[in-house]
């Protein structure tokens, strides 16, 4: 139905053209006249087709403890991740401009030090985010390079710009937080690995160390509802579509925009683990 006329008292009928159906969904997508959009009754009439219902195979998502991501992260792994930011954002050739060192601060604060050692820029900090933030400080204030969420200016100087003495920066704020649920659904509902990688690079470069990343939370819901005894189809009907997760996770709605394909659960879980 696409017109603005109300249904007559006896209702309106729509032919399915002898199609077989196991589920009938009715979506109310748009109502511009007012905020009231009502459905009083729906009757589905037909005869049994005799076609057996195809069983839905179980969704197989590997537990984290059994996955390749369940590993201990070493200091060298952390330094390699920071070097990965250099390679992705300004070019692999510039990795040799820098050396990195991880060391805790005596006062317990997050910090970084910039200095020059053996002709290279030495960045010292207490964790990977601190190292990345120090890297960004050097790029911004010594090289006039700007890395942002929407575009980069990465015209590097021809040679290393020296750092005189030591530049020391620290923060007394242990948590630097980013996002809320609405951000994830407005901007990131269908982000893949590349978009998330660019964003996580930018967050680390700017000192953010706590990120609300609800990627694959639908898999948590799938497992939880399954353990409560709901069928696979009932679970999928409850979970909203990707563009509406913010409102579903804030308990404002359920099911709207769904269901998602079974592969969505496995693919999003894989993405979430890559993002960690």
Regions found by a protein language model. Give the residues of each.
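Short amphipathic beta-strand/extended segments with alternating polar/hydrophobic composition
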Residues: 2-3, 55, 113, 125-126, ...
């Amino acid at each position: 139905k696409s017109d603005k006329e109300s249904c007559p008292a006896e209702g309106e009928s729509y032919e399915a053209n002898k199609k077989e159906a196991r589920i009938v969904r009715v979506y109310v997508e748009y109502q511009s006249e007012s905020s009231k959009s009502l459905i009083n009754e729906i009757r589905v009439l037909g005869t049994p087709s005799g076609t057996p219902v195809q069983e839905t195979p179980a969704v197989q998502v590997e537990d984290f403890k059994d996955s390749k991501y369940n590993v201990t992260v070493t200091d060298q792994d952390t330094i390699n991740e920071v070097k990965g930011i250099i390679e992705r954002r300004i070019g692999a050739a510039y990795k040799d401009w820098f050396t990195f060192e991880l060391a805790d601060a005596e006062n317990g604060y997050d910090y970084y030090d910039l200095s020059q050692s053996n002709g290279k820029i030495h960045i010292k900090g207490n964790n990977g985010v601190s190292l990345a933030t120090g890297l960004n400080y050097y790029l911004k204030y010594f090289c006039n390079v700007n890395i942002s969420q929407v575009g980069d200016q990465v015209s590097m100087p021809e040679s290393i710009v020296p750092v005189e003495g030591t530049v020391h920066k620290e923060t007394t704020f242990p948590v630097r937080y980013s996002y809320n649920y609405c951000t994830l659904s407005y901007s990131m509902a269908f982000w893949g690995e590349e978009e998330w990688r660019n964003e996580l690079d930018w967050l680390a470069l700017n000192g953010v160390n706590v990120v609300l990343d609800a990627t694959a939370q639908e898999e948590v819901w799938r497992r939880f509802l399954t353990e409560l005894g709901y069928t696979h189809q009932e679970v999928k009907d409850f979970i909203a579509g990707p563009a509406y997760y913010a409102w579903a996770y804030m308990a404002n709605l359920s099911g709207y925009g769904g269901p998602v394909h079974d592969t969505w659960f496995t693919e999003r879980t894989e993405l979430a683990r890559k993002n960690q």
